[in-house]
A protein has these predicted regions:
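Signature of N-terminal electron-transfer/Fe-S-associated modules in redox systems
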Residues: 1-164
């Protein structure tokens, strides 16, 4: 029996320990937001957070996440309460086909959690492992930059108003 936390809930599963995390989340827990793209950890469509770090889950055996915290796109925000990146994706009309977008958002969220004010080059480096076959890279980058800029503006306002 493998236990872990999935989107804030303690869960367990009794599957082959070599089963990729992606398939456990999709097939056993019915969370379909993370996608299968390549099966080799190259495209990023399957990206989830494991203890806060972006990880390609199509090549991550479920045994590797025992007792860890997993966050999927479903755990990042809700339709009623979007994560700032999800809102920015809408504002900047990022998706075209949408297939890769959950992985893109998860990679971007891990980046901004680790570095709230990334440079253009840092965004490129962090997002390099996520492929968008539709070529939406400029819109993806603008959305990430807008969230970073808005967070910095909010932090500056909070400090000015004595809330920080």
């Amino acid at each position: 029996m493998i236990q872990f936390t999935l989107n804030g809930q303690s869960v367990q599963t009794d599957v082959d320990p070599n089963t990729p995390l992606l398939w456990v989340v999709r097939d056993h827990f019915k969370l379909k937001g993370s996608k299968f793209g390549c099966g080799a950890g190259l495209c990023g469509a399957c990206t989830m957070h494991v203890d806060g770090a972006a990880l390609k889950t199509c090549v991550t055996p479920i045994a590797a996440v025992a007792n860890k915290s997993i966050t999927t796109i479903e755990g990042l925000g809700t339709p009623e309460d979007l994560h700032p990146l999800q809102a920015a994706w809408h504002e900047h009309a990022v998706p075209q086909c949408g297939y890769c977008q959950s992985g893109q958002i998860m990679a971007a969220a891990a980046l901004l959690d680790a570095n709230p004010n990334p440079s253009s080059d840092e965004i490129d480096a962090a997002m390099a492992g996520n492929i968008c076959r539709c070529g939406c890279y400029p819109r993806i980058k603008r959305a990430i930059q807008s969230v970073s800029e808005n967070a910095l503006a909010y932090d500056a306002m909070a400090q000015t108003e004595g809330r920080a």
